[in-house]
Amino acid sequence: MRAMAYSRFGPAPNVLALNTLVSTPPADGEVRVKLAYSGVNPSDVKARAGARPGVVKPAFDLITPHSDGAGIITDLGAGVSKERLGERVWIWNGQWARAHGTAAEYITLPATQAVALPEGISLQTGAVLGIPGLTAAHCVLGGGAVAGKT
């Protein structure tokens, strides 16, 4: 599959390159998603630039960046409902704690990180629901019930 990736820190034009990588089949509890869109977050930019305190080199030899995205589930690992095959999903924390994020044609990740996208919501919109959407939910709901407070 085609994937953008980097092996050293720096500005995107200096370190990102198009690569041909193997798409990993899903393990137990995982799904493989054919990505339509990849969302870019400030945390992705900071990670690629090496701007996180105390981090002096990339965590993996080659990193496909980006945490968020959207696409269609194409393959299922054991233990994942067959009903999910073909499901439109949005992805959150795609590149967290692993080398392969959403700047690729496919991503394989835990099924819980591929959330069903409601009808009427485009894949393009789904690609920006991950970190921004979860951040908004935590801001609104983190202080307890919101009933009567709006």
Regions found by a protein language model. Give the residues of each.
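Nucleotide donor/acceptor-binding cores
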Residues: 1, 87, 148-150
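Short structural boundary motif marking the start of a folded domain
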Residues: 1-4, 31
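Extracellular beta-rich ligand/substrate-recognition surface
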Residues: 7-15, 67
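Short gly/ser/thr-rich secondary-structure transition/capping motifs
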Residues: 12-18, 53-55, 97, 134-135
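Conserved hydrophobic/aromatic beta-strand scaffold that supports enzyme active sites
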Residues: 18, 23, 70-72, 106-108, ...
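Glycine-rich beta-strand-centered segment in the early N-terminal region that forms part
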Residues: 22-40, 52-95
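Cytochrome P450 core scaffold surrounding the K-helix E-X-X-R motif
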Residues: 43-49
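NAD(P)H dinucleotide-binding glycine-rich loop of Rossmann-like/cofactor-binding domains
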Residues: 67, 82, 92-150
